[in-house]
């Protein structure tokens, strides 16, 4: 059986499994409802009344935008169509971050590549200023031809990274194991497109080909479903009352763990949990997150 047919059959079987804890599908609102540009305003193009935007990168600058509010817990998503063609050296990002020195951060970073070579999706989690929890996967589709939804479910129990409806990573609250978990620093949502050819593609060996500029990444789906808080707030005033706080979102169910296992087994190219040169002892959260 051909590998593409086998992949299709696996996807269909996973999609047909019943599960009870999928995040809600976000509604569509225009860019200006929840977001503002952060730099290089002239490198952002607005389409369809602001329901879609394009970020442009050239040899002079990239650009980006951020949420107006800060949030403690919720479900945060973005529909993104990545830079097509030769995107080597570029990074398209969607992430949450707090603003102080010992910051918390939840990252999606899409690392560009030469034409015909696949994108790499790198995820990372920073807690109390400590990161170094990179995981890298290939995607099972071409992310440049149409929009796909990338999202984060963040509550007191876990952080789940999703690609469309597929969980690709879980970071459990392992505070009892001595691992900090983001629970008291509100985060803003950031999106950006920039040049990172000193590291992004093959460790910096592949440089950005500026003859291909401008590089364009497209975004839509600007709804935010989170507990809005001031930057200095230490708790969500509706904690325990929102849909993402309910018992069915405190863990993945069997079907979701099956989907995650499929992604890990088929598409993982790096996982800090299994990097014995970097960590002689398995980081304590990895067992709970089923990463080993």
Swiss-Prot record:
Q: Which domain of life is it from?
A: Eukaryota
UniProtKB keywords? Apoplast, Cell wall, Cell wall biogenesis/degradation, Disulfide bond, Glycoprotein, Glycosidase, Hydrolase, Secreted, Signal, Transferase
Q: Which Gene3D superfamilies match?
A: 2.60.120.200
Q: Which organism is it from?
A: Phaseolus angularis (Azuki bean)
Residue positions annotated to bind xyloglucan are 109, 122-124, 132-134, 198-199, 203, 278
Q: Which GO terms describe its molecular function?
A: hydrolase activity, hydrolyzing O-glycosyl compounds; polysaccharide binding; xyloglucan:xyloglucosyl transferase activity
- GH16 domain mapped to chain residues: 21-219
Localization terms from the record = Secreted, Cell wall; Secreted, Extracellular space, Apoplast
- Record carries keyword Cell wall biogenesis/degradation: yes
Protein name from the UniProt record: Xyloglucan endotransglucosylase/hydrolase protein A
Q: Does the keyword Hydrolase apply?
A: yes
Signal peptide from the UniProt entry: 1-20
Q: Glycosylated residues: list them.
A: 113
What job does the chain carry out? Catalyzes xyloglucan endohydrolysis (XEH) and/or endotransglycosylation (XET). Cleaves and religates xyloglucan polymers, an essential constituent of the primary cell wall, and thereby participates in cell wall construction of growing tissues.
**Any Gene Ontology CC annotation:** apoplast
* Organs and tissues of expression: Predominantly expressed in the phloem fibers of growing internodes. Expressed in xylem cells in the basal part of the internode. In the internode, it is expressed closer to the top of the internode compared to XTHB.
> Per the record, where is site Important for catalytic activity?
107
Looking up CDD domains in the UniProt record yields: GH16_XET
The family classification in the record reads: Belongs to the glycosyl hydrolase 16 family. XTH group 1 subfamily.
All disulfide bonds of the chain are 227-236, 273-286
What does the PTM comment state? Contains at least one intrachain disulfide bond essential for its enzymatic activity.
